[in-house]
C-alpha cells in the first residue's frame, strides 16, 4: 500500500549549496533563462523545490511472505559517504553505492533494466550519474527522474520517487519519461517506455557527499 501526498511546488526559493550557484530552479530563474526543470538534457536543467510525503512498509523476508498484503518490491541497499563538501562529477560516489548494492544482493548487473536516478538536473549531478551508470551497467537499461515533474522534496525524495516509479509500473507497465526533455533519448527517457524484464536500481544523494543505491 502506497500513501502519497504531493503539495503544489514552492517557487521563489533558491538553494545554493556545495558552491553550485543556482542549484535549484526558481520561477524567476526560469523566466530569465527560458529553461524548465529537467535532467540529463542539453537545454533544460535544474529543479523546483517541492513538498511531499510517502508511507511504505518494510519487512524482512520471513514476515513479508506471510503478510496478506501483496509484495510490491524487494530491496538491498548500500551507501557511500565522506565528510567532503561537494559532489564528485566523476561519479565515484554513485559508483561505490551502486556496486555495494549489487554485491550485497549478488545481482547480475546486466539484468538491471530500470534506473530511478537522483536526477536533480544540475550540471554536476548529470555528469556524476551518467559517469557512474556508464561504468557500472550494461547499455540495456532505461532511466527516469521525477524531480522535474514534482520538485525536489526535502528528505522524502528517494523513497517517494521510488514508490512513484513502482506505482507507475503497476498501473501502466511503463517507466515515466523525464519531464521537459528537448531531445529524443531512449535511455534517459524522453517518452514513457515499457522496460525489459529485470531489476530496478534506485539512486539518491544527500548533502555532505552521501550516495545511496538500492
What label would you give each PLM region?
Residues 1, 97-105, 132, 136, ...:
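Stable alpha-helical structural segments in soluble proteins, enriched in small hydrophobic residues
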Residues 1-63, 155-214:
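Conserved beta-strand-centric core segments of catalytic alpha/beta enzyme folds
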Residues 21-25, 29-105, 111-114:
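Condensing-enzyme catalytic core mediating Claisen C-C bond formation in acyl metabolism
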Residues 74-75, 143, 200:
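Conserved beta-strand scaffold positions in the cores of enzyme catalytic domains, especially
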Residues 84-94, 121-137, 153-160, 191:
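Short glycine/threonine-rich loop-to-helix capping motif typified by GTGT followed
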Residues 118:
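Glycine-centered flexible beta-alpha turn that most often forms the glycine-rich phosphate-binding loop
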Residues 139-151:
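Conserved phosphate-binding/catalytic loops in two-lobed NTP-binding clefts
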